[in-house]
Swiss-Prot record:
Organism for this UniProt entry: Porcellio scaber (Common rough woodlouse)
Propeptide, chain numbering: 68-112
The protein, known as: Androgenic gland hormone
Signal peptide extent: 1-21
Keywords per UniProt: Cleavage on pair of basic residues, Developmental protein, Differentiation, Disulfide bond, Glycoprotein, Hormone, Secreted, Sexual differentiation, Signal, Spermatogenesis
Keyword Glycoprotein: yes
Disulfide partners: 33-122, 42-59, 44-140, 123-131
Biological-process GO terms, alphabetical: cell differentiation; sex differentiation; spermatogenesis
């Protein structure tokens, strides 16, 4: 009976912790695979969990139009521009109004400027990093173009 209670408690704790699997469409594999920590820092910054952190360089995803996880054809399109963009410029409306702190209920897919797609395919790299209470699972995918 104690074993069952332990397993149920462990399962509840595991399900309570939010897990985000990230892969940004159009991300160049050499950029994301070469500097996993920096990419995770970018993700945490975009989530608003490190609102005062300064990034040493631009985050490795380009500024493009609206993105959606439902657009599978978009995975194979060429990048139209090579400009890099700081994620703070992509803040959701709550952050644009001056409130830098994002609420947990704010969905990542409610972005008006662009959406980030989430996929699990990777280049044999799976890292987990703690972003405050959120575990970031970063999957790095190698693109063949």
């Amino acid at each position: 009976m104690k074993g069952l209670l332990f397993i149920v408690s462990l399962l509840c704790l595991t399900l309570h912790q939010r897990v985000w699997a990230y892969q940004v469409i159009g991300m160049k594999s050499d950029v994301i695979c070469a500097d996993i920590r920096f990419t995770v820092h970018c993700i945490c910054n975009e989530l608003g969990l490190f609102p005062t952190s300064r990034l040493s360089k631009p985050c490795p995803w380009p500024n493009r139009g609206r993105r959606s996880a439902d657009d599978e054809d978009y995975l194979f399109e060429e990048d139209e521009d090579d400009e890099f963009f700081h994620p703070r410029a992509l803040s959701p409306p709550a952050a644009k109004s001056g409130d830098e702190r994002l609420e947990d209920e704010v969905s990542f897919h409610s972005r008006s400027k662009r959406d980030i797609a989430f996929h699990e395919e990777c280049c044999n790299i799976r890292t987990e990093h703690k972003c405050n209470k959120t575990t970031v699972e970063l999957y790095c995918r190698r693109y063949t173009r």
